[in-house]
Amino acid sequence: MNDALPSTDQGAAGPLIPVLAVVGVGLIGGSFAAALRRAGQVGRVLGVGRNAASLARAVELGLIDEAVSAEDAAARADLVLLSTPVGGLKNVLSRMLPHLDAATVVTDAGSTKAEVVDAAREALGERVGCFVPGHPIAGAERTGPEAADAKLYAGRTVILTPLAENSAASINQVRRAWQACGASVIDMDAGAHDRVLASVSHLPHLLSSVYMEQVATAADARTRLDLAGSGFRDFTRIAAGSPEMWRDIFLSNRDAMLAELADVRAVLDRAERAIADGDDVTLLALLDTAAQARRNWRKE
């Protein structure tokens, strides 16, 4: 964990979030708690998770003050962040529902939004207005509480996909929490979010993982890996992420993923034909377009 020491700069009015509950105290949830502590905008932090040892470690690291059940978190927290694999959100919300305080706001950090919104509606019913869907565009291949970084969200973008049932106050509370972490916050439609993220986040991870699996299972895998250099390292870095989390993301965003796979397969087929035919003009044009686009990309 980096820079997770608590700050005391809360101001006369006290912290923005008196009691925060984080469900899933790993890279995303742990960094959220650490960033709010660093900003002096959280009072007490409750941690919820499946692994008692991991929660105990989160307490040792100062990410959370105590480990509690999902039900207890729902009853006590002013804001709940769900940072678990998206496939498990419906179950967590169903457990929380009978215990949710009327003023409690719930948000998530899931990488897909349309299916998460559907799950929230099914789980929460008429209380769905307390759930403000969100997605921080930040992450790393590291996992667990040790991966938490108070600066993870500084300068990053967080996308909210508010529901018609959300109150302005609930949306603003989530927005201000992410801003306190150093992030810029924008709003998007859930479907548009999923289509864009399938292209620039989900598909790259799948391609990295598929390539890594192909190399790792080859008959001469040991030789290949021994000779691999920086290009291999850079391309496969994200394949080291949580398999459970990414499985859920791919399946949750199935339609958009299939559309993106069809598009990238068409380009791959074009490149394969150019190589097979010795078509240097087509191959050079493809590589030049890619190189120029990457060089002109505004972020690093």
Specify the residue positions occupied by each region the protein language model found.
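NAD(P)+-binding Rossmann beta1-loop-alpha1 motif at the extreme N-terminus of oxidoreductases
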Residues: 2-75
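Short secondary-structure boundary/capping segments
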Residues: 12, 71-72, 98, 123, ...
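Conserved short alpha-helix immediately C-terminal to the canonical SAM/SAH-binding motif I
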Residues: 53-54, 88, 113-116
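Rossmann-like NAD(P)-binding element
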Residues: 70-107
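Short glycine-/small-residue-rich Rossmann-like dinucleotide-binding loops
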Residues: 84-86, 110-111, 136, 211
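Rossmann-like NAD(P)(H) cofactor-binding subdomain of soluble oxidoreductases
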Residues: 95-146
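Internal alpha-helical scaffold of NAD(P)-dependent oxidoreductase catalytic cores
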Residues: 152-237
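Interdomain hinge/lid region at the active-site interface
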Residues: 221-290
